[in-house]
């Protein structure tokens, strides 16, 4: 079997496993892939694949924190229904804070991270349902707040 075939098979198996929404740790994913015949897989490779495919940790139907893939792979766009996941946007003198639905913060943060410094975003930190955004020196927190509100069509 060629390397590209092996890689394609690994990617298919990886995506299939994540669709099951039952893996709470990278170690569990490694074990499942080894069980499917990918003996050379390790935690480092799984970590890179999770990042590459935009996997996030969210709660499944049993309320367990598990890895899953966003519906559309790659960097999400504002034209997707992400704006519906934003519940509240606020700011103070230092940060812009976004509150999202449960498990949605990492997906929204990924979009914001992709915009980067060109939009005045120095950094983004996301939890399960809360995102902190720090502006660059060239942008005030109020300007960043207004920009983020416009991005998600948030009227407050």
Curated annotation (Swiss-Prot):
Pathway in which the depicted protein is active: Amino-acid biosynthesis; L-arginine biosynthesis [regulation]
Stated name of the protein: Arginine repressor
Gene Ontology molecular function: any one: DNA binding
InterPro entries hit by this protein: Arg_repress, Arg_repress_C, Arg_repress_C_sf, Arg_repress_DNA-bd, WH-like_DNA-bd_sf, WH_DNA-bd_sf
GO cellular component, one term: cytoplasm
Record organism: Vibrio atlanticus (strain LGP32) (Vibrio splendidus (strain Mel32))
Similarity-based family: Belongs to the ArgR family.
Chief localization: cytoplasm
GO BP terms, alphabetized: L-arginine biosynthetic process; protein complex oligomerization; regulation of arginine biosynthetic process
Function recorded in the entry: Regulates arginine biosynthesis genes.
Gene for this chain: argR
Subcellular location: Cytoplasm
Signal peptide: none
Residue stretches spanning the membrane: none
Keyword terms: Amino-acid biosynthesis, Arginine biosynthesis, Cytoplasm, DNA-binding, Repressor, Transcription, Transcription regulation
Database matches in Pfam families: Arg_repressor, Arg_repressor_C
NCBIfam families: argR_whole (TIGR01529), PRK05066.1 (NF003457)
């Amino acid at each position: 079997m060629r390397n590209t075939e092996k890689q394609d098979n690994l990617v298919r198996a990886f995506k299939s496993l994540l669709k099951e929404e039952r893996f709470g740790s990278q170690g569990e994913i490694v074990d499942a892939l080894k069980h499917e015949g990918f003996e050379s897989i390790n935690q480092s490779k799984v970590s890179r694949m999770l990042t590459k495919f935009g996997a996030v940790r969210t709660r499944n139907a049993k309320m367990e924190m598990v890895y899953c893939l966003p519906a559309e792979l790659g960097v999400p766009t504002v034209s997707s229904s992400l704006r519906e996941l934003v519940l509240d946007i606020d700011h103070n003198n230092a940060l812009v804070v976004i509150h999202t639905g449960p498990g949605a913060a990492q997906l929204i943060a990924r979009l914001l991270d992709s915009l980067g410094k060109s939009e005045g975003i120095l950094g983004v930190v996301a939890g399960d349902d809360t995102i902190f955004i720090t502006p660059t020196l060239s942008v005030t927190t109020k300007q960043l707040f207004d920009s983020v509100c416009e991005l998600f069509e948030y009227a407050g």
